Amino acid sequence: MKTIEVVAGVIRDGEKFFATQRGYGEFKDGWEFPGGKLEPGETPEEALVRELKEELAIDILVKDFICTVEYDYPKFHLTMHCFYCEIQRGTPQLLEHENAKWLSLAELNSVNFLPADVEVVKKIKREF
């Protein structure tokens, strides 16, 4: 089974967390924390800065590491490195996603997160 290595940013603003809804592909309409694939030679932090600039037109500061999720989807294995992030410049623009929401801790279960991201939500809820 093919392994895909990605990064995800849990963007925080006070007690709110930014989630995005996929607008394309096999998992269209599923909710996730934004990010994407690592390119050769990139650190996870560098990939996250690049991906969030490409997807949301924002500059971020990568903060604390949350966890690495290992998840088997039907067609591939996902390794996802997750970090808390803070917006340094810009307002998120949906360049690749169809929707986005700022969610409180209590609202995190109000959207249909993709399975790997559900693991991140559980970790966040344990920390707060």
Language-model features: locations:
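Hydrophobic packing within well-folded, soluble alpha/beta domains
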Residues: 44-53, 65, 83, 100, ...
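Conserved Nudix-box catalytic region and its N-terminal flanking loop in Nudix hydrolases
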Residues: 16-54
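Conserved hydrophobic "DFG−1" position in protein kinase catalytic cores
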Residues: 11-12, 19, 85-87, 102
